[in-house]
């Protein structure tokens, strides 16, 4: 999707790209090597898009949530669903990020539902 939109963003001289990555793109925890590696790769893609788009006014934010109360997290035993980040709260955060001026767009936005140790 980003590849398809890229030329139009460049032509417009501005644009915002938000990528939902994961906290697993910022640190390795547990034994899910493939999942973690894919999220680290996604962070690298975000950094490259940021670097390539900066001079054209394109801003990229990698949103990195921990546990979000979705079907993917349904089997998590270490945290009750009500303590996880709620999808609507993540959506509100993403909407707010779009209101920021280009000079204040964060590259990374870590969202923790619990204290990371």
Where are the language model's segments positioned?
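Active-site helix of classical SDR
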Residues: 2, 38
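Short, flexible catalytic-loop segment of classical short-chain dehydrogenase/reductase
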Residues: 65-75
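Residue(s) in the substrate-gating loop at a strand-loop-helix junction
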Residues: 22
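C-terminal helical subdomain
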Residues: 55-58, 62-63, 79-117
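Active-site loop-to-helix junction immediately N-terminal to the catalytic Tyr of the SDR YXXXK motif
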Residues: 28-36, 48, 77
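Active-site-adjacent segment of SDR/Rossmann-fold oxidoreductases
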Residues: 8, 27, 48-58
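A short helix-coil junction within the Rossmann-fold of NAD(P)-dependent oxidoreductases
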Residues: 4-13
């Amino acid at each position: 999707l980003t590849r398809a939109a890229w030329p139009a963003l460049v032509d417009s001289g501005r644009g915002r790209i938000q990528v939902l990555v994961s906290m697993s793109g910022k640190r390795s925890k547990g034994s899910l090597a493939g999942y973690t590696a894919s999220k680290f790769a996604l962070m690298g893609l975000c950094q490259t898009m940021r670097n390539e788009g900066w001079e054209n006014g394109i801003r990229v934010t990698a949103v990195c949530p921990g546990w979000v109360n979705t079907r993917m997290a349904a089997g998590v035993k270490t945290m009750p669903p009500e303590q996880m980040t709620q999808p609507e709260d993540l959506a509100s955060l993403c909407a707010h990020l779009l209101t920021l001026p280009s000079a204040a767009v964060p590259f990374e936005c870590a969202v923790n539902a619990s204290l990371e140790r």
